């Protein structure tokens, strides 16, 4: 148990027993921790930090009877804070993203089998140039059918048909490679 946990838990227990000064001190200490927590997560909106701190402190006050004193107080308070932050993001329609670099190890496990990648490269190479270019532009690069068609010098409709045929041919070649 950390010093902060020990101190906060003791203050909150005393506060629940009616010690107003201890309760006020506990909320003040928790407020400092909450500010730091929200500042790390709300770097783009520092004005919202104080609102979140106040909302969380109010929720802690209103829901204090749900805290099991046999459990960690800081873990319970952190959960309340996290839910308040998520509610804030939902109200503001904010989608929080995490840097991809944080998940490199996790993603590495899902890396494609090099043998499959080689077979796919071979299958792509066997397609006519226009079809290969359409597959690359639309499926790998992310261009729209209209953009890929313009690059290939054909209409969007023709690009759609050619892409469909190319994907069908690729699927057939990959099935034969597996069989």
Swiss-Prot record:
Disruption phenotype: Not essential even when cells grown in the presence of dichromate or cadmium (CdCl(2)). Loss of dichromate and cadmium induction of the regulon's genes, including partial loss of its own expression. A double sigF-nrsF deletion is viable, whereas a single nrsF deletion (for the cognate anti-sigma factor) cannot be made. It comes from the Bacteria. One of its GO terms (biological process) is DNA-templated transcription initiation. GO terms for cellular component: cytoplasm. InterPro entries: RNA_pol_sigma-70-like, RNA_pol_sigma-70_dom, RNA_pol_sigma70_r2, RNA_pol_sigma70_r4, RNA_pol_sigma_r2, RNA_pol_sigma_r3/r4-like, WH-like_DNA-bd_sf. Keywords: Cytoplasm, DNA-binding, Sigma factor, Stress response, Transcription, Transcription regulation. This is ECF RNA polymerase sigma factor SigF. The lineage of its organism: Bacteria, Pseudomonadati, Pseudomonadota, Alphaproteobacteria, Caulobacterales.
């Amino acid at each position: 148990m950390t010093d902060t946990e020990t101190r906060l838990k003791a203050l909150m227990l005393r506060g629940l027993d009616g010690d107003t000064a201890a309760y006020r001190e506990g909320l003040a200490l928790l407020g400092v921790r909450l500010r730091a927590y929200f500042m790390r997560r709300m770097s783009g909106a520092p004005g919202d930090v104080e609102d979140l701190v106040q909302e969380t402190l109010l929720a802690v006050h209103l829901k204090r009877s749900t805290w099991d004193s046999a459990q960690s107080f800081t873990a319970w308070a952190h959960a309340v804070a996290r839910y308040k932050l998520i509610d804030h993001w939902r109200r503001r329609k904010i989608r929080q993203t995490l840097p991809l670099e944080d998940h490199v190890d996790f993603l590495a496990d899902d890396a494609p089998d090099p043998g499959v990648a080689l077979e796919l490269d071979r299958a792509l190479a066997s397609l006519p140039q226009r079809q290969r270019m359409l597959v690359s532009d639309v499926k790998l690069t992310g261009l729209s059918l209209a953009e890929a068609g313009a690059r290939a010098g054909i209409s969007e409709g023709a690009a759609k048909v050619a892409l469909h045929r190319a994907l069908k041919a690729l699927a057939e070649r990959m099935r034969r490679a597996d069989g």
